[in-house]
Amino acid sequence: MRCRTVLGGALALLAWLAIPAAAQQPDRWTIPIHTHTLDNGLTVVVSEDRSSPTVGVSVVYHVGMRLEPENRTGFAHLFEHLMFQGTPVAPKGTFDRVIQGGGGILNGSTRPDYTNYIETAPVSALRPILWLEADRMKTLDFSETNLKNQQDVVKEEIRNNVQNQPYGGFMWIDIGMQAFQKWENNHDGYGSFKDLEGATLADVEGFHRDYYGPNNAVIGIVGDIAPAEAFAMVEEYFGAIPARPTPPRRSSRSTA
């Protein structure tokens, strides 16, 4: 009995001593993060992951539904659509052909405080992805045809996802309108048809100029690439894009 007691005590002591040692072991789930800021203000975040020969890219702009003008509800989301309509150098459809044609995927989404554009593809596609993202950061194909087309697309999206979902769906639209008093938080980010139809090319050009500069963006790269190599690529494609003034942020984010 005494032998068992001593043995049990010894095992307990070993277990207790092992706790600090285990705590000192590196966390195998720690994700390596490297950051760098270009001279034009673009923030670059890179995480090397050699588990597969792929890469994920996310370009995030610090503008979302909260910053759209009061008479232009839904404009941030509409503008996200226009970012896929091509540029003078890379016409509409180029993004899809280059990325999806090489086995990758792409998408975009609009949130209250940011809008992001993502691509996942073989690592060999990283240079084309960065070139395309830099190209549409510089300018877009500002045309009445593209604007009218995407106004109709967004209105159809509203019909399908909001108006024809009487028993559920996008509850966050109703919650925001009921929970908050300030317009920035309680308006419908999808927008009204009247506001969407009222958007002009001048609105589009101004929004791109004010919010889609490198100093208002973060680009994240995760995948089969060394941080130094990724930083060099971003510098190559984005470094010459000049920083642009951004409108002052509203003084308060209070929702009271």
Spell out what each predicted region is:
Residues G8-P20:
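Bacterial N-terminal signal peptides
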Residues M1-C3:
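N-terminal secretory signal peptides that target proteins for export/translocation
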Residues T87-P88, T94-F207, E236, R250-R253:
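Acidic/histidine-enriched segments that form metal/cofactor-coordinating
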Residues A21-D96, I118-A121, R127-A134, E205-A256:
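His/Glu-rich zincin catalytic helix
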Residues G9, R66-E68, G191:
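Short hydrophobic "helix-edge" motifs at membrane interfaces and signal-peptide entry regions
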Residues L7-G8, N40, G103, Y190, ...:
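Feature targets compositionally biased, intrinsically disordered low-complexity regions
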